[in-house]
Regions:
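Feature for soluble, non-membrane regions of globular proteins
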Residues: 1-193
Length: 193
């Protein structure tokens, strides 16, 4: 099956000034799109051509896996942000976060520290473990919880291309802004349910 670049779940300028239209033009329009194009080219005439994106991620390796995982990760990441985002989670997810970390503030501090400390290019995830608890997990360049027993709830992209246009080399400022103004807790809560 041919994969398509998923549209953003909001207007390209909807997250400005915290995430600019220019950042989306490069991050979504060029980087994310390149993963889609590469995946389509790499899977041609292989067993993966008839599989869903999730099946490809779970069964492939090398370039096909890297591009498939990056397509999925980016599509997921766009939904982790929303216009006028921020705030704190509620309900069962808030209870799980408080149960694991003691408070939302302690969770946020741990997540920011983990994301800032994620060496090189990668992703920092809030995941639901098989036992129903939550945890923070760092993955490398194309890592994704889809290949584990964890369920992705929320992620922040810490590849430099994710934040360099708006934040230059200030990854901590980007991650702090993600929580203050962009995070979509409703999406994470729906994933937790």
């Amino acid at each position: 099956m041919e994969h398509k670049l998923s549209p953003l779940p909001y207007a390209i300028d909807a997250l400005a000034p915290q995430y600019s239209q220019e950042a989306f033009e490069y991050h979504h329009g060029k980087h994310h799109n390149a993963y889609v194009v590469n995946l389509n080219n790499l899977q041609k005439d292989t067993e993966f051509e008839a599989m869903t994106l999730e099946e490809i991620i779970k069964k492939s390796s090398g370039g096909i896996y890297n591009n498939a995982a990056q397509v999925w990760n980016h599509t997921f990441f766009w939904s982790c942000m929303k216009p006028a985002g921020g705030g704190e989670p509620t309900g069962a997810l808030a209870n799980a976060i408080n149960g694991k970390f003691g408070s939302y503030a302690a969770f946020k501090e741990a997540f920011v520290k983990s994301a800032v400390g994620n060496f090189g290019s990668g992703w920092t995830w809030l995941v639901k473990k098989a036992d129903g608890t939550v945890d923070i997990v760092n993955t490398g360049p194309a890592g994704t919880p889809l290949t584990t027993a964890d369920k992705a709830l929320l992620t922040v992209d810490v590849w430099e291309h994710a934040y360099y246009i708006d934040y230059r080399n200030a990854r901590p400022k980007f991650v702090e802004t993600f929580f203050a103004d962009l995070v979509n807790w409703e999406f994470a809560q729906a994933n937790f349910a």
